[in-house]
Amino acid sequence: MFQCKIERAYIHAPYFINLASSEKHIRLNSINVIRDELERGSALGCRALMFHPGSAKDVGQEKGIKLVIEGLDRIMDGYTGSCQLLIEISAGAGAVIGDSFEEIASLLDGANRGAEIGVCFDTQHAFASGYDLRTDSSVRKTIKDFDRTIGLECLVVLHVNDSMSEFNSHKDRHEHLGNGKIGLEGFKTLVGLKSLSHVDLILETPDDNLRRKDLLVLKNLR
């Protein structure tokens, strides 16, 4: 990474992970995969590993949250690595865990080592889950709500994506910056907030060939 001039690298855990599954073997496999990824990330010098907690469709939200907390405790038990675990906000499809600030806060508060776990804020997922990011005022309100509910000290990285799907649609559909339902006004405010100056930005827009243009858009907004 040093040779490639990469200061901070991040890992995304596999999408099949489900700490809220009704099946014990799925939960255990998910725990092992995340722990292995954390250890691997530490060995590689990666900054953090983000993951989606999973779906509670077979057990209900209350039980699902308890299972995720149990999973987090097992993942973090004895862990001494440098790669930080991050919960990424979800778009809210089905019975997923972690599609609201309140649910993420409950996971961090409930886990034994929750103070060591951070958050990845994906703009498209948040928008699809009902957090408005289209205007200066709506972005400021959303970030204020995040700070009040979770705490900006827990926010480590932003996945910066416009949204192909409508506001509060609960659909995970990324779009290139300025071409989606969020628009550039919100992103201009987001990248200019001093309260987020400590946060890294990662683009997850769909077409690799157009991502350089998205990067230029972000730089111009600043």
Predicted regions and their residues:
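Short helix-capping segments at alpha-helix termini
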Residues: 2-5, 77-83, 111-116, 149-153, ...
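Active-site beta-loop-alpha junctions enriched in small/polar residues
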Residues: 14-16, 54-56, 88-94, 124-128, ...
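Active-site acidic/histidine proton-transfer and metal-coordination neighborhood
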Residues: 19-118
